[in-house]
Amino acid sequence: MANINKLYSDIDPEMKMDWNKDVSRSLGLRSIKNSLLGIITTRKGSRPFDPEFGCDLSDQLFENMTPLTADTVERNIESAVRNYEPRIDKLAVNVIPVYDDYTLIVEIRFSVIDNPDDIEQIKLQLASSNRV
């Protein structure tokens, strides 16, 4: 079993300056979680050199909140993560609609490919920005 804190690194999404005046990095599990959030929150088609990167979530967030909406979001997230995050194993996505708030609670459970016995979790709330 490898030490994933040394194995994986990415540029920190906050783009803070490090002590050596270089862009800071996120390491290990944090880099994988940041990557997942980047995949989920990037609108498909917004990257000119890879138009398939990201999820089509904004259209669903403006639809009527139904079980079908939650299922579509769940499938979109699962497909995008499987296509763009190779460090993930045992992926499970669960989307829970909150009808009164017009929001979706997204729970993502996964394991890192180098450590498949440890299950990690990300939980986030998605909402349209134009709520009445």
Curated annotation (Swiss-Prot):
Superkingdom per UniProt: Viruses
> Which InterPro entries does the entry mention?
IraD/Gp25-like
- What keywords does the record list, in alphabetical order? Late protein, Viral baseplate protein, Viral tail protein, Virion
Tell me what turns on expression of this protein.
Answer: Expressed in the late phase of the viral replicative cycle.
- Where in the cell is the protein located? Virion
Q: Which GO terms describe its cellular component?
A: virus tail, baseplate
- One protein family per Pfam: GPW_gp25
Report the coiled-coil segments. none
Tell me the disulfide pairings in this chain: none
Q: What task does this protein carry out?
A: Baseplate protein that is located next to the tail tube (inner baseplate). Involved in sheath assembly. The gp25-(gp6)2-gp7 module is involved in sheath contraction.
Q: Spell out the subunit comment.
A: Homodimer. Interacts with gp53 and with the (gp6)2-gp7 heterotrimeric molecule; The gp25-(gp6)2-gp7 module is involved in sheath contraction. Part of the baseplate macromolecular complex which consists of gp5, gp5.4, gp27 (central spike complex); gp6, gp25, gp53 (inner baseplate); gp7, gp8 (intermediate baseplate); gp9, gp10, gp11, gp12 (peripheral); gp48 and gp54 (proximal region of the tail tube).
What is stated as this protein's family in its record? Belongs to the GpW/Gp25 family.
What is the protein name stated in its UniProt record? Baseplate wedge protein gp25
Organism per entry: Enterobacteria phage T4 (Bacteriophage T4)
The record lists the lineage as: Viruses, Duplodnaviria, Heunggongvirae, Uroviricota, Caudoviricetes
Chain's gene name: 25
